[in-house]
Amino acid sequence: ETPTRTGWECKCSDSSDPLVVAASIIGILHLILWILDRLFFKCIYRRLKYGLKRGPSTGGVPESMREEYRQEQQSAVDVDDGHFVNIELE
């Protein structure tokens, strides 16, 4: 048997140690952000996906180069479409 000493009990519940307080706050914030991410992930990632797809600004670029860039982007999209399975719902 190992003798028990007084003062070895866990004091996590009533601890005022700054490290414990900071860890608790970070844990709670992480949990809140994770829940929000799971609830709104479709909206968030759709906005990020289409918000970043606008491409670079075309100010000062000749129209012929703009058209060439559009064609390159479209051909890249056409190539990528072959990797996906299209499911049509009736």
UniProtKB/Swiss-Prot annotation:
Organism superkingdom: Viruses
How is it regulated at the activity level?
The M2 protein from most influenza A strains is inhibited by amantadine and rimantadine, resulting in viral uncoating incapacity. Emergence of amantadine-resistant variants is usually rapid.
Please report which positions carry a covalently bound lipid of kind S-palmitoyl cysteine.
43
User: Which residues make up the annotated site Essential for channel activity, seems to be protonated during channel activation, and may play a role in the channel gating and selectivity?
Assistant: 30
Keywords of this entry: Disulfide bond, Host cell membrane, Host membrane, Hydrogen ion transport, Ion channel, Ion transport, Lipoprotein, Membrane, Palmitate, Phosphoprotein, Signal-anchor, Transmembrane, Transmembrane helix, Transport, Viral ion channel, Virion
Q: Which residues lie on this side of the membrane: Virion surface?
A: 1-15
Which residues, by range, are in coiled-coil regions?
Answer: none
Chief site of localization = virion
Region described as Disordered: spans on this chain: 53-76
Q: Which residues cross the membrane?
A: 16-36
Concerning Pfam families, the annotation shows:
Flu_M2 (PF00599)
Is Metal-binding included in the keywords of this UniProt record?
Answer: no
GO molecular function annotations of the record: channel activity; proton transmembrane transporter activity
Localization of this protein: Virion membrane; Host apical cell membrane
Supply one GO CC term from the record: host cell plasma membrane
| Location of Phosphoserine modifications | 57
> Which positions does the site annotation Seems to be involved in pH gating cover?
34
Topological domains on the Intravirion side lie at 37-90
Note in the entry: When the channel is activated, one or more imidazole moieties of His-30 probably become bi-protonated.
On assembly, the entry states: Homotetramer; composed of two disulfide-linked dimers held together by non-covalent interactions. May interact with matrix protein 1.
Task: Give the domain note.
Answer: Cytoplasmic tail plays an important role in virion assembly and morphogenesis.
Per the entry, what this protein does is:
Forms a proton-selective ion channel that is necessary for the efficient release of the viral genome during virus entry. After attaching to the cell surface, the virion enters the cell by endocytosis. Acidification of the endosome triggers M2 ion channel activity.
Recorded family membership: Belongs to the influenza viruses matrix protein M2 family.
Protein name as catalogued: Matrix protein 2
Q: Give the species this sequence originates from.
A: Influenza A virus (strain A/Guinea fowl/Hong Kong/38/2002 H5N1 genotype X0)
What's the source species' lineage? Viruses, Riboviria, Orthornavirae, Negarnaviricota, Polyploviricotina
Q: Which gene encodes it?
A: M
